[in-house]
Swiss-Prot record:
<feature type="compositionally biased region" description="Low complexity">
    <location>
        <begin position="11"/>
        <end position="42"/>
    </location>
</feature>
<dbReference type="GO" id="GO:0106002">
    <property type="term" value="C:mCRD-mediated mRNA stability complex"/>
</dbReference>
<feature type="compositionally biased region" description="Gly residues">
    <location>
        <begin position="43"/>
        <end position="56"/>
    </location>
</feature>
<dbReference type="GO" id="GO:0051592">
    <property type="term" value="P:response to calcium ion"/>
</dbReference>
<keyword id="KW-0539">Nucleus</keyword>
<dbReference type="GO" id="GO:0003682">
    <property type="term" value="F:chromatin binding"/>
</dbReference>
<dbReference type="GO" id="GO:0032212">
    <property type="term" value="P:positive regulation of telomere maintenance via telomerase"/>
</dbReference>
<feature type="modified residue" description="Phosphoserine">
    <location>
        <position position="188"/>
    </location>
</feature>
<keyword id="KW-0832">Ubl conjugation</keyword>
<dbReference type="GO" id="GO:1901355">
    <property type="term" value="P:response to rapamycin"/>
</dbReference>
<feature type="modified residue" description="Omega-N-methylarginine">
    <location>
        <position position="276"/>
    </location>
</feature>
<dbReference type="GO" id="GO:0071392">
    <property type="term" value="P:cellular response to estradiol stimulus"/>
</dbReference>
<feature type="modified residue" description="Phosphoserine">
    <location>
        <position position="80"/>
    </location>
</feature>
<dbReference type="GO" id="GO:0005654">
    <property type="term" value="C:nucleoplasm"/>
</dbReference>
<feature type="modified residue" description="Omega-N-methylarginine">
    <location>
        <position position="280"/>
    </location>
</feature>
<feature type="cross-link" description="Glycyl lysine isopeptide (Lys-Gly) (interchain with G-Cter in SUMO2)">
    <location>
        <position position="195"/>
    </location>
</feature>
<feature type="modified residue" description="Phosphoserine">
    <location>
        <position position="81"/>
    </location>
</feature>
Length: 353
């Protein structure tokens, strides 16, 4: 917590830090306050940096108040303490559940009311289709205590709104995969690869360029994918939505792997450049990844999401783009992805974000 956030005079700040800590931490905070009396006597916020209470006491207090820490997260605040971050991530991993197989008619209230019988529900969310507003058939529940998750898992079958649902423990990824790939839409098929490389090479070293081909005409399509060596060029490029490449005004979007896309979807996105491409905060504050392949590779399986063109390289299928990503302008052919003219790199399944 920064000095400005801590606020108040030094003595009050030290006392506040001491409240949330253990006896040892309280004593440490008081000693620190006494040693910093000169600083505490001033009107500045610097007196609130008592080491004994800030790190230990604040971590315990905020860790115990789930809803408070989540609100801070929603508002974009972050705690720079690695100890705080690791503890909060570990606790959320124990408190959070993925709920699959939901009825299309199930509401957030239904979800919360059902799982409240297992313990205090701090928050819950349903994942909705951004175009239709319809439920995707799955969501997440955050409990106040990990014991509630155990109770849910101990029950063999769960039914909600007349349908058997599929609750699972949520799993947190330890690292965030950097985004190094972009989608370039509205590109003239006649634009030479050299011209594309020259323009985007001005932002950073280009690792590979994918030039998709129509599998019927064997001609290039009006878009491409570019992978950079580092993540920084993507951040620079995403500062503008449109770029002039050759004679074309191109729309740029972040291309994300399946795993990256899953991370972004868990509990929404906050902060980071990827989300700005969608017009809201992006970049996962908690990198949640369920690892439940049946909800992804089969288009969310029984959740009826095949129509969105989600699986494998079909993520580039333009049936999916038209109905979900709104890329109709780049979809003159409705025939999946076809051949890809590619220079360097390896093939992977990506999605524009």
């Amino acid at each position: 917590m920064s000095e400005e956030q801590f606020g108040g005079d030094g003595a009050a700040a030290a006392a506040t830090a001491a409240v949330g800590g253990s006896a040892g931490e309280q004593e440490g905070a008081m000693v620190a306050a006494a040693q910093g009396a000169a600083a505490a006597a001033g009107s500045g916020s610097g007196g609130g940096s008592a080491p004994g209470g800030t790190e230990g006491g604040s971590t315990e207090a905020e860790g115990a108040k789930i809803d408070a820490s989540k609100n801070e997260e929603d508002e974009g605040h972050s705690n720079s303490s690695p100890r705080h971050t690791e503890a909060a991530t570990a606790q959320r991993e124990e408190w959070k559940m993925f709920i699959g197989g939901l009825s299309w008619d199930t509401t957030k209230k239904d979800l919360k009311d059902y799982f409240s019988k297992f313990g205090d529900v701090v928050d819950c969310t349903l994942k909705l289709d951004p175009i239709t507003g319809r439920s995707r058939g799955f969501g997440f529940v955050l409990f106040k205590e990990s014991e509630s998750v155990d109770k849910v898992m101990d029950q063999k079958e769960h039914k909600l709104n007349g349908k058997v649902i599929d609750p699972k423990r949520a799993k947190a990824m330890k690292t965030k995969e950097p985004v190094k790939k972009i989608f370039v839409g509205g590109l003239s098929p006649d634009t030479p690869e050299e011209k594309i490389r020259e323009y985007f090479g001005g932002f950073g070293e280009v690792e590979s360029i994918e030039l998709p081909m129509d599998n019927k005409t064997n001609k290039r399509r009006g878009f491409c994918f570019i992978t950079f060596k580092e993540e920084e060029p993507v951040k620079k490029i995403m500062e503008k939505k449109y770029h002039n490449v050759g004679l074309s005004k191109c729309e740029i979007k972040v291309a994300m792997s399946k795993e990256q896309y899953q991370q972004q979807q868990q509990w929404g996105s906050r902060g980071g450049f990827a989300g700005r491409a969608r017009g809201r905060g992006g970049g996962p504050s908690q990198n949640w990844n369920q690892g439940y392949s049946n909800y992804w590779n089969q288009g969310y399986g029984s959740y009826g999401y095949n129509s969105q063109g989600y699986g494998g390289y079909g993520g580039y299928d333009y049936t999916g783009y038209n109905s979900y990503y709104g890329y109709g302008d780049y979809s003159n052919q409705q025939s999946g992805y076809g051949k890809v003219s590619r220079r360097g790199g390896h093939q992977n399944s990506y999605k524009p974000y």
